[in-house]
């Protein structure tokens, strides 16, 4: 029997506001334990939450970017549960009326086709703290993350393969990043994914029993975990067994999903309206203000790069996959940088350097200005493409002007015949055996002189000019 895969994803995204959702403390990642806390985060008696307007701004932008309807009558709810990293014993979230609902996103699949994935809802909530378990036998609670604003985006169960789930996450990350509401860095926990997967016989409308997957710390692991689950569940069903409703985690080392707990039924969080956060209305003017702040999104940028700048579909997709890279490209082209050359550098030498250094484009000293200047001095013959790679590394590490560095470092190409011809004659004098081979008609003997000349000029001879002059002087040599 063949089965149809049914997948839905729940994605938690940390919003990049300066302060938390209900307290004025910093929402910055990476500070010392409990440095970003105050009496609200610790839930001292008598303290009251104060809603950060910037969080609602971000929620509206997310809803608009994901083609969602917006609930204009806004309220929050209490989700009641006890855990050490949740000092209030409840989480302020949204239950029956999320900020956004009934949305969709179009994703591009590996075969070049597109598919529209439905988004059921997007709701705002506060994050919980973090428990760590020490080797000394004690457990510790860090509340830096407590109260950091989240938006949870819940898809419809519209994905029919791990490939589609991967494509959905890729598209969702792009949209959220371009909207400017999160840096969506999975390695820092600002984007977290839970997956729900079930199988059903083809043609059956009723969903099968679902399994929830956690510990999915990369898009690649989401895909691998789902692929494993498809195989595991299919084997159970084909052997006459039944799928249990359970939560499993993906074990990267063993490339398998591991049971965490069996779900006996849906958790009862006893939701009720949050009494300490008043009702408020999102007026049409507020929504339109947020709409005007939304940028051009990846799909539109890709189309423009192809139609207006003459880039290939592949180059356009690569450039727009990351907003930082795309914005860098935009600035470089605005400075009259050649679009194809800038694209080639960003996808080639720049990408290789970032991978080798383990850095992002924001963390190096390269700027659109000095990259465009470097490309210009390649084009005007000041430096060769080979020398340019060394210049780029210097710019990436130290910044500054490309032309200024090249001149100070003595890297300017030698293009003057008055300088090159005496060097060519000296090459002949220093390599008498090669001259004899050339005059005797030995095959490819002339090519050796190219290497000798480049060595003599320390690679600074302009290749086009040097080869032309070398051919000219070799012809004279043969006549003598």
Curated annotation (Swiss-Prot):
Provide the GO biological process annotations.
Answer: glutaminyl-tRNAGln biosynthesis via transamidation; translation
Query: What is the catalytic activity of this protein?
Result: L-glutamyl-tRNA(Gln) + L-glutamine + ATP + H2O = L-glutaminyl-tRNA(Gln) + L-glutamate + ADP + phosphate + H(+); L-aspartyl-tRNA(Asn) + L-glutamine + ATP + H2O = L-asparaginyl-tRNA(Asn) + L-glutamate + ADP + phosphate + 2 H(+)
Gene3D superfamilies assigned: 1.10.10.410, GatB domain, N-terminal subdomain
Asked whether the keyword Coiled coil is assigned, the reply is no
Mind telling me which Pfam families this protein's record contains?
Answer: GatB_N, GatB_Yqey
The molecular function GO annotations come to: asparaginyl-tRNA synthase (glutamine-hydrolyzing) activity; ATP binding; glutaminyl-tRNA synthase (glutamine-hydrolyzing) activity
Q: What EC number is given for this enzyme?
A: 6.3.5.-
Entry keywords, A to Z: ATP-binding, Ligase, Nucleotide-binding, Protein biosynthesis
Return the PROSITE patterns for the record: GATB
Family membership:
Belongs to the GatB/GatE family. GatB subfamily.
Describe the function of this protein. Allows the formation of correctly charged Asn-tRNA(Asn) or Gln-tRNA(Gln) through the transamidation of misacylated Asp-tRNA(Asn) or Glu-tRNA(Gln) in organisms which lack either or both of asparaginyl-tRNA or glutaminyl-tRNA synthetases. The reaction takes place in the presence of glutamine and ATP through an activated phospho-Asp-tRNA(Asn) or phospho-Glu-tRNA(Gln).
Q: How does it assemble?
A: Heterotrimer of A, B and C subunits.
Question: Under what name is this protein listed?
Answer: Aspartyl/glutamyl-tRNA(Asn/Gln) amidotransferase subunit B
